[in-house]
Amino acid sequence: MLPGLEAAELPADAIEVGRIADAWGIKGWFKVLPYSADPEALFSARRWFLLPAEKGAKTFSGVAQLAIKEAKVHSDTVVASAQAVDDRTAAEALRGARIFVARSSFPSAEKDEYYWVDLIGLNVVNREGVAMGTVKELLSTGAQTVLVLEYSQDGKAQERMIPFVSVYIDEVDLPGHRILVDWQADF
């Protein structure tokens, strides 16, 4: 383990939100490549959990906890500073580390806004009560977000796409693990 990093357990609700790209400056700051266009989850979490890069990890192994002092947008990326990462050499040692934060530390979503991670795995049903599938992933097409559903037909895995816009989405029931849509099964 690198000096200053604490060994830790990955929280049960941990979500991978980015990775450390490189050192930034000489005072221990480092560049972060967030996986989201809105890095708000990175900014709200005071503790980040690091896993080594998937290949060639030489600096640390296992899960490490990092206490974040500050994180901010800089140009097209995010830069951050952490306790016990005091110089460029320490920051360089984190290069490639995968960043996880506890889902419980995300800021609350606004009304009728959802974190994609909360939608994955939900069952989708249309107004007629027909099961449309389970949310496998979401795609951003630029104009809108699209739900990618997975369902089985004749024993074969199939995919169906539904735009995630209010015209087609009647209700998102996170506690009920369900999305109600205005969409025909044969469309």
Swiss-Prot record:
Q: InterPro entries per the record?
A: PRC_barrel-like_sf (IPR011033), PRC_RimM (IPR056792), RimM (IPR011961), RimM_N (IPR002676), RimM_N_sf (IPR036976), Transl_B-barrel_sf (IPR009000)
The reply on keyword Lipid biosynthesis is no
Query: Which Gene3D superfamilies is this protein grouped with?
Result: PRC-barrel domain (2.30.30.240), RimM (2.40.30.60)
Superkingdom of this entry's organism?
A: Bacteria
Q: Name one GO molecular function term.
A: ribosome binding
Can you say where in the cell this protein is located? Answer: Cytoplasm
Q: Which family does it belong to?
A: Belongs to the RimM family.
Q: Could you tell me what this protein is called? A: Ribosome maturation factor RimM
Whose protein is this, by species? Albidiferax ferrireducens (strain ATCC BAA-621 / DSM 15236 / T118)
Lineage at the top is: Bacteria, Pseudomonadati, Pseudomonadota, Betaproteobacteria, Burkholderiales
User: Which gene codes for it?
Assistant: rimM
